[in-house]
Swiss-Prot record:
Enzyme class: transferase
SUPFAM superfamilies linked: PRTase-like
Transit peptide: 1-87
Protein name: Ribose-phosphate pyrophosphokinase 3, mitochondrial
GO biological process, one term: purine nucleotide biosynthetic process
Record's compositionally biased regions (Low complexity): 18-32
EC number: 2.7.6.1
Region (Binding of phosphoribosylpyrophosphate): 309-324
Amino acid sequence: MAATPHRHLLQPCKNPAISSSETLKPSSSFSLSSNPSIPLIRRRLPTFRCDFQNRRKWMNVDHHISKLNPIQIVPNSRRFQMSSNQENSVEFSKKVCLFYCPETKALAERIAAQSDAIQLRSISWRTFEDGFPNLFISNAQGIRGKHVAFLASFSSPGVIFEQLSVIYALPKLFVASFKLVLPFFPTGTSERMEDEGDVATAFTLARILSNIPISREGPTSLVTFDIHALQERFYFGDNILPCFESGIPLLKKKLQQLPDSDNITIAFPDDGAWKRFHKQLQHFPMIVCAKVREGDQRIVRLKEGDPTGRHVVIVDDLVQSGGTLIECQKVLAAHGAAKVSAYVTHGIFPNKSWERFKPDTAGCPEEGMTHFWITDSCPLTVKMVKNRPPFEVISLAGSIAAALQI
């Protein structure tokens, strides 16, 4: 037996508020348009009024059109345009209260400048006479039910405790959600044990962060950039959600702005850097260097690729003493590189090791670098190298502001 058509398909739609004898007036809210090139069976009314206040009642619209030419609803009201604009700005629709430590104040201000949806909140960072922290979160009741984030900088063991005290306290203030932004994960290079008795401090810090109290919406989200080893994501427990971001997209934008952007070649100082970043830089020619041991020394050699006549940019996740980058620079220059630059997401530079890098002012790539790009993930380093060639700082503010909306 054939199925009986639905009763709404057999009868015209009816609305008690509109009779069949009444003339429907054109509406300023919506208009119906059809393609004049396709003939219609019958078209009596060009426009009709949509009664949203009585949307559950059926309207009597005697309007026959071709099945091949469906009605197009064209928005022309100011109210609809406003809603469209809101959809276009959905990237920053979530309002976030951003706290920060003293080291990250400048970065926090740059993040807040990205969007009006990010509001800076203050914390009083004081100490007792014995040196232990005396902390106070201003207007604690004002963040109830709101999305809260904290911008941290674990630049030294001494500041970790006071920041952890705040990090553990914020989720307990009845906030809707809590996000920890730690641009540089400081113990990332201590992720493995080679001898019995070695302590993997990366695992220790991951366990500490994994025990941050949950907020009303669930576990804490952790945003960090270019962590040293991707397998460190498995160090974190189930009570934290790591979000691993990268500064490489910012580097690619910077390289596109160079006058010799079509002559760029990417070099990796070792296999680890190649495995970490080569997929994000596939459209560039690549060079891979390798560390080899000769006697008691470890030297850098060219493993594959040709730097002759190219502007070679060395890419790695972090730099400390800078010895590997300098050796790589010398090898590339010896093999004919026209220019040598470098990029690292995290410029740590303990003991002012940044002073080892000189600018190339005479066209001698073996003596200096054309550019040395770092991000502002390590605020103390940014203060030291500011306005000192060849260093240039690429800010993570835009990337962090976008991550706060996740």
